[in-house]
Design a protein with these regions (language model features):
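Long, charge-rich boundary regions
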Residues: 47-102, 106-108
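N-terminal Rossmann-like or analogous alpha/beta NTP/dinucleotide-binding catalytic cores
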Residues: 1-8, 84
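Residue-level signal for inorganic ion chemistry
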Residues: 6, 10, 65, 213
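Short secondary-structure capping/junction motifs at helix and strand boundaries
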Residues: 8-19, 74-76
Length: 249
């Protein structure tokens, strides 16, 4: 009954999504069932593949779910777990033109104030535009990287913050505020199911973007005063805006 109500209100829908697939059991595995790229039950290789499945559009009613936790008689610990699981992100959608194309790459960011510090973009290996954005000279490297990524679960990708990997698509985006042309990369630290599956990278003010920029020799432009970007990113939101045109000061 509950599922039917969700379906009637457009909150239950079918979509093709990347899943963990055991090559031996021939079934979908939860992230917790994948250990170092293999199935915890049979030890066979686990790959990432697309599969059509029913989804619940939790983000469409996340605010109500979170707010109404105040009206239920749950213990505090459970309410905290629910709030963390549902999540609430406040930010902005930004569209970046693709150089030489009519397309615009959409991202969601909780730090639109750092837009002038964007020096590259990253899309998830499963992003629907991977093939379109990959140039001929980069195709072989991209295909090899995608194949490698399919052997890792999302849980491993999220947890492994020290490992830095990625590959150039060969395409470029245009920063809508600075007008700067910036490269588009593919990396497994971006997840297709989170936000739009693409990010604007601000290495001066995000630790994972910082590690990526250092690894690939990309520009790091601070736009919030504070910290020492020669050593690490300055992730704090407090500070004077710099190098940001009308936002500076």
């Amino acid at each position: 009954w509950i599922f039917l109500q969700l379906f009637k209100h457009g909150l239950a829908y079918k979509a093709s999504m990347p899943v963990n697939w055991c090559t031996s059991c021939k079934c979908v595995l939860a992230n917790e069932e994948v250990v170092e790229g293999v199935c915890e039950r049979c030890g066979s290789a686990v790959i990432r593949r697309e599969k059509s499945q029913w989804m619940l559009a939790i983000t469409k009613y996340a605010d109500r779910l979170i707010d109404d936790l105040d009206n239920v008689d749950y213990i505090s610990r459970v309410k905290i777990q629910q709030r963390n699981w549902i999540g609430r992100s406040v930010g902005a959608q930004v569209f970046f033109d693709i150089a030489g194309s009519e397309r615009k790459l959409e991202i969601f960011t909780t730090r639109p104030d750092t837009i002038y510090g964007v020096t590259f973009m990253v899309i998830a290996p499963e992003h629907e535009w991977v093939e379109e954005l990959t140039t001929a000279e980069n195709r072989e490297a991209v295909e090899a990287y995608i194949a490698e990524t399919k052997r890792r679960s999302e849980r491993e990708r999220i947890a492994d913050t020290k490992r830095v990997s990625g590959v150039k698509t060969g395409s470029y985006a245009i920063n809508p505020f600075s007008g700067r042309e910036i490269p588009i990369y593919i990396s497994d630290y971006v997840l297709a199911g989170y936000g739009t599956g693409a990010i604007m990278a601000v290495p001066a003010h995000d630790s994972r973007d910082y590690a990526f920029a250092r690894h690939f020799g990309l520009d790091i432009v601070p736009v919030v005063e504070g910290g020492n970007i020669e050593v690490e990113s300055y992730d704090a939101k407090e500070g004077k805006m710099i190098k940001s045109d009308f936002l500076s000061g």
